[in-house]
Amino acid sequence: MAQADMVRISVCYARPDSVFLKEFDVLQGTTIAAAIVSSGVQQVCPEIDPSTMRVGIYGKLKTPDTVVRTGDRVEIYRALTADPKLARRRRVQKTRESGTREGQKWLRGGA
């Protein structure tokens, strides 16, 4: 197999306690789904379900059938653990209740 038939990519998956990052060569025309399987990430992180997890390349969402190119970093995204709007409301409420100057600013309407 000629080197020209191969592309160098990396596969990344982050957990709260660790990161899986592997750089390797795959054949041209390999899809994101095939690259994930080839990386071995599912043996290290068994919670990954390719049929339900969202994937992307450098922070841009892609479909699993997208073909990878040289230099791509395939990212596997975890589901959100908290609703961002609800988390912000809780932070604001906590700041308001703290009695600090910043908390008082929230109560006065930002002045």
From Swiss-Prot:
UniProt biased composition (Basic and acidic residues): 94-105
List the residue ranges of the region (Disordered). 88-111
- Which InterPro entries does this one have? Mopterin_synth/thiamin_S_b, RnfH, RnfH_sf
Q: Which domain of life is it from?
A: Bacteria
Gene3D superfamilies found in the cross-reference section: RnfH-like
Do you know which SUPFAM superfamilies this protein is assigned to?
A: MoaD/ThiS
Membership in a protein family = Belongs to the UPF0125 (RnfH) family.
Q: What is this protein called?
A: Protein RnfH
